[in-house]
Amino acid sequence: MGSGSIKKILIVDDDVALMRVIREALTSFLRCEVDTSPNPEYGFELALTKTYDLLIFDFSMPMIDGAMLFFLIGKAYNHAEPPRIVPPLLLVTGRGDEKRAQELLKEAGVRGLVAKPFVINRLLEKVKECLPGIESVGSPK
């Protein structure tokens, strides 16, 4: 799979409307396939059954936050036979989460934060930073 391959992205966010907007923006402007889940438990199952190039998780979700979900996926990947490579993570954060989320940037695999509310162009830039080989298919106005 060269850099021209379609990148696969998993979004987990309990804000369904925002998740749909993110998916639409990614698939409109970048060459990628996007799976989504408003439910961290189902997102975990998707991550175990499919292979992704990038994870985009909401930091603040009920039951399991984005950081914990990433940690659990990492543990499962490390214990898989053969061990799997954990894709990079972009965390989407809301107000009040910034301080803890900033600390998570020091963790291996956490590639960036996008604070809500955000401009779609900012998110697209972050995705391109995480996936340097991703191809653009359109240009946002």
Task: Describe the residue ranges of each PLM region.
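Conserved sequence signature across two-component system core domains
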Residues: 12-13, 37, 55
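Two-component/phosphorelay signaling modules centered on CheY-like receiver
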Residues: 16-35
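Helix N-cap/capping motif at the beta->alpha junctions
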Residues: 36-45, 66
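Short amphipathic alpha-helix used as the core "switch/output" element in two-component signaling
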Residues: 45, 67-85
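Active-site residues of response regulator receiver
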Residues: 58
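Receiver (REC) domain active-site loop signature in two-component systems and cognate sites
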Residues: 61
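Alpha4 helix (beta4-alpha4-beta5 surface) of REC/receiver domains from two-component response regulators
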Residues: 68, 84-86, 96-112, 121, ...
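A Lys-centered signature of the CheY-like receiver
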Residues: 116
